[in-house]
Amino acid sequence: MKHRIQHIHFVGVGGSGMSGIAEVLLNLGYTISGSDLNESAVTRRLAELGMRIAIGHDRANVAGAGAIVTSTAVAGDNPEVLAARAARIPVVPRAVMLAELMRLKRGIAVAGTHGKTTTTSLVASVLAAGGLDPTFVIGGRLTSAGANARLGQGEYIVVEADESDASFLNLLPVMAIVTNIDADHMDTYGHDVARLKSAFIEFTQRLPFYGSAILCADDANVREIMPFVSRPITTYGLSPDAQVCAQDVQADGTRMRFTVQRRDRDVVLPALQVELNLPGLHNVRNALAAIAVATELGVDDAAIREALAAFKGVGRRFTQWGDLPVPAAHGGGIFTLVDDYGHHPVEMAATLAAARGAWPQRRIVLAFQPHRYTRTRDCFEDFVRVLGSADGVLLTEVYAAGEAPLVAADGRALSRALRVAGKVEPVFVEDVGELPQAILDFVRDGDVVVVMGAGSISKTPALVGELA
């Protein structure tokens, strides 16, 4: 990719998708600068790597850049974008830059409404264990690598493919995974599920004729698009007809044990005994996708088993903060704290089911910050249903993510609906800054507290730890 452009500037470099691309380009020898509205652990790390990082957006930040990269979170009237356009500096969408990176290697792209980050991480980990030394760009921090991106020396690059803005249609992988298709980010698709499915079909059609589509057989919407996928398909899941199928699945604390039966067309491969260092059936499916990729690429079974058993997880995906003391005023004892990024009812239900499977005799308490008013509105009844499945609920105001408030879909409305449903009495905490103390006021000995959401609630577990 070496050419006349040597300096690339990232507007919003602290974002998970942006920071990974910036890091890989830096390791390829480019001069990288970036700006973000807020300082964070991500921006500090990028600065330590050698990037020039500015906090705040200013026209002067683009000086000397040959191109600037933006995400969909960056508005068109951003001063750095305006300065670049005025100076005829190319303004490149994040997905287009990711597509350019993928042209350097053989791309494996992971798409789907839920499970992308974990599945991408599992694929990268299994390929690394198999000696393929992949490059990866992930939407979360891979714990074993301490980063969400790495430049490998092998021929493969593993990336997350983002359907939220349809930008995954810029990518040209040789292998494409689709974990599931669910109604989320529907503004992009005109609130038309058929258009959403068509986008996923188009995503698979961008594979070359020798490419491979790895599709989850357990998802009804994925099954519906299969007849329209014209590339070779490998199916995976718990369904008996899946080519890569998990059987005899058992939960063992926060680990899962299962047997994988594999069929390569008409050839039956040896069964694979797997111990996965993640909880929940949803993670069994994520692991099956990685096994399907690894099997197709010839990774040794022993390496697959080793990688899955030793997998250390991804930041904010069922991250266990450990056991903390219950205040003496509430009887003392300990409670277990878990942090999770889930913000859609389907993701939340899967995580809560995993928690129940891991700790079947304990009370599951959910501390949740809804993310976006439009999602809360569109999935309102589903949120009420999944929140009602917890034994205790602490609910904050909606994290707006730039949206205007909707009174009928705010935190209070959700709390009222949950109370009327009668399954659980919620504690409404309007200010998320007060949530850590509210959690400590609520917990009792033996509780498992799952802190969940995609917004500012991410700071809560550390604050609970400090207060406890």
Curated annotation (Swiss-Prot):
Main location: cytoplasm
Catalytic reaction list: UDP-N-acetyl-alpha-D-muramate + L-alanine + ATP = UDP-N-acetyl-alpha-D-muramoyl-L-alanine + ADP + phosphate + H(+)
Enzyme nomenclature, EC number: 6.3.2.8
One GO cellular component term noted in the UniProt record for this chain: cytoplasm
Cellular location(s): Cytoplasm
Keyword Plastid among record annotations: no
A molecular function GO annotation: UDP-N-acetylmuramate-L-alanine ligase activity
Residues at which ATP binds: 112-118
Gene Ontology annotations of biological process type: cell division; cell wall organization; peptidoglycan biosynthetic process; regulation of cell shape
Its biological purpose: Cell wall formation.
Entry similarity comment: Belongs to the MurCDEF family.
PANTHER family: UDP-N-ACETYLMURAMATE--L-ALANINE LIGASE, UDP-N-ACETYLMURAMATE--L-ALANINE LIGASE-RELATED
Protein name: UDP-N-acetylmuramate--L-alanine ligase
Organism encoding this protein: Bordetella pertussis (strain Tohama I / ATCC BAA-589 / NCTC 13251)
Lineage: Bacteria, Pseudomonadati, Pseudomonadota, Betaproteobacteria, Burkholderiales
Name of encoding gene: murC
